[in-house]
């Protein structure tokens, strides 16, 4: 297993690996495999690229192969959203409280805080930039910045209808 993502939550360190999710309890010096399943019996078994806790307390998990998972620690419920993409690369929450997910195929995806899909912002094939994958996300002052392909930068202005691409 290689570690690809980390998130701190109280005394716990959530660890995204090449084969699932683990939690390290620092107070007990103990590792646990995150074995929660969805109501359909699905558990996180593939590469975890990003783990983010949103303002409402839900934990969003981006995977390469199983899409997005959302864990509610209060209700102890895990849900999976793979309808829009199986290959989620990164997650960030904007200043508008919406959750943005980068996809290897579908561009920038936008969800409300509960996980309801709102809209996608695809990378235009007309730009002829080759690789259409959105690699990483970062929220800065009402803008969602992203790495696109191998030589491009994208910017989505919260509330707008398009993802602008800048060639580097």
Go through each PLM region and give its residues.
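Carboxylate-rich, polar loop motifs that coordinate divalent cations or form catalytic acidic clusters
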Residues: 1-168
């Amino acid at each position: 297993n290689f570690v690809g993502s980390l998130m701190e939550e109280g005394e716990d360190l959530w660890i995204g690996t090449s084969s699932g999710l683990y939690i390290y309890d620092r107070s007990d010096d103990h590792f646990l495999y995150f074995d929660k399943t969805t109501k359909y019996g699905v558990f996180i078994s593939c590469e975890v690229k990003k783990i983010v806790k949103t303002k409402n307390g839900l934990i969003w998990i981006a995977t390469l192969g199983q899409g997005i998972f959302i864990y509610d620690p209060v209700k102890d419920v895990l849900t999976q959203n793979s309808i829009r993409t199986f290959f989620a690369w990164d997650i960030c929450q904007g200043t508008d409280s919406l959750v943005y997910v980068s996809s290897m195929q579908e561009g920038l995806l936008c969800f409300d805080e509960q996980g309801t899909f709102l809209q996608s912002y695809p990378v235009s094939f007309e730009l002829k930039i080759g690789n259409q994958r959105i690699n990483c996300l970062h929220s800065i002052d009402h803008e969602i910045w992203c790495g696109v392909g191998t030589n491009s930068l994208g910017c989505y202005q919260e509330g707008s209808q398009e993802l602008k691409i800048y060639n580097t």
